[in-house]
Structure formats: C-alpha cells, structure tokens
Design a protein with these regions (language model features):
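Juxtamembrane transmembrane-helix termini in multi-pass membrane transport proteins
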Residues: 25-80
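Membrane-embedded alpha-helical segments of transport systems
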Residues: 51-59, 81-85, 92, 208-215
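Juxtamembrane transmembrane-helix boundary motif
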Residues: 1-15, 36, 66-172, 192, ...
Length: 245
C-alpha cells in the first residue's frame, strides 16, 4: 500500500511539473498516465484528474485574484455556463463507453497540441478594438489591465457574449467528461469569440477552473467514481509539482 501511495504521489508530482511547464494544468497528463501505464479504469482516472485540477486551481486562486489581468465580472458570468456544462458532462461520463472517452481524449490532445503551436508562433496579444454588445454593455463586462511588457494600460471591450457562452458550455462539458481544466476552450471563447486580449483571457480562464472543477467533483463523488486512495496522493503530488514547475 505504501509503495502504491508513493508511486501515485510521484505521478502527481510529474503531472504537476509538466502541466506547469506547458501551461496545460496537471489534469491533461494524469488521465493518460493512469490508464495507459497503470491500467486504471478511465472513469476513475477522470475522477482523480478532476480533483487534481481542483487542487491546483484552489492553490492558485489567491494569486489569480491579485492579478489585475483577471476580469472577475466576466469570470462570474461565464461560470454560469461552464458549471451547467460540467453537470451535463459529468452525467454523460456515466453512460459514455470507455472507448469513446479514449477517442475524445485523443482528439483533445491533438487540439491542445495545435493550440500550443499557435501560441508559440503568435506572440502578439489581441488588443481588441471591438465594441461591447448589448449584454456586455448592460453587465459592464469590459475591462483594463496594465501590461508590464508593453509598459502601458490595455483597455478592452467584449463582443459576441452569446457565442462565448455557448463555447463556455462546451468547455464545461469537456472538463467534466475528460477530467481536465479545458483552459484551451475557455481561452478560445474569450480571446477568439469575445475578442478579449489573450493575457486577460488566460488569467480569467485559470481562475475559472476551480469553480468548474468543483461542480464536476461533486457529481463524480456522488456516483462513486472518486477513489480516495487513488485521488489523495495524486492531488497532493500535483499541488507540489505545480509549485516546482
């Protein structure tokens, strides 16, 4: 038992370090490692991954709140849709065949690789010149932050809130279904669809992962797909690894 706990802790540390270095979060690493290397059922691996995402995001929540790039109003509004999506995704996970989950996970990894490639080759931030749409205007969703790299204050407005909300719902579904933070989809919603600057989108997405993860974790706990012996050492390891990375 001690060997098992030690091994799972090392898996968590590895996932936390790799996730921090690649900007993916530990969740996207844990599920394939547990299923392919240790033969863990993918549904229990997803449950462990969800808790790991929750642990890392909770540990970083204070830092995100202090980040002036975070748009808290947008985060709270869009969490309505990601949380609804998370409950739908968690329910789907119960009835979805394991082979389908593997296929979805492989597709997601390809999308994540493409997303990383774009980030590497596109260094420019999206300084939005769009105007607030009616919903954004009413809810005052625009924002500003000081960009230390550019040494100037970036002011921005947001548009296409309905379109961004739909993508956020999908992000919530994928997050709960596959046990990931789904940050790539959340950034896609804010940066590409809603025309927010990339830095503000990333900071806001990172903050949102904890809320989405909580909704998913509650359902996974309720249906018995969270194994404490598996989850505890992995979550502690990911938390430690994320600080090291």
């Amino acid at each position: 038992m001690l060997t098992y706990i030690f091994t799972m802790t090392l898996v968590g540390i590895f996932a936390g370090i790799l996730g921090a270095l690649l900007g993916l979060g530990g969740g996207i690493v844990i599920t394939p490692v547990l299923t392919l290397l240790f033969g863990v059922d993918i549904k229990y691996a997803v449950g462990a991954s969800i808790i790991a995402v929750l642990a890392t995001s909770s540990g970083s929540a204070i830092a995100y709140l202090k980040d002036d790039m975070l748009n808290l109003r947008i985060a709270m509004f869009l969490e309505i849709f990601t949380t609804l999506g998370a409950f739908v995704g968690a329910m789907l996970s119960v009835i979805t065949d394991s082979q389908v989950l593997f296929l979805l996970y492989g597709t997601l990894m390809l999308f994540q690789a493409f997303n990383m490639y774009q980030k590497i080759h596109d260094k420019k931030d999206n300084q939005s010149v769009s105007h607030n749409d009616a919903i954004a205007e009413k809810l005052n969703l625009g924002g500003e932050y000081f960009d230390k790299g550019l040494n100037q204050t970036i002011k921005y407005q947001v548009t296409n809130v309905p379109g961004g909300s739909v993508v956020m719902f999908f992000a919530g579904v994928m997050s709960a279904l596959l046990g990931i933070g789904a940050g790539a989809f959340k950034v896609l919603a804010m940066d590409t669809v809603m025309k927010m600057p990339l830095k503000a989108s990333s900071a806001t997405s990172n903050f949102m992962m904890g809320v989405t993860g909580t909704a998913s974790a509650i359902f996974y706990l309720f249906v018995g797909q969270i194994n404490p012996v598996l989850v505890t050492p992995i979550a502690l390891g990911v938390l430690a690894g994320s600080f090291i990375g």
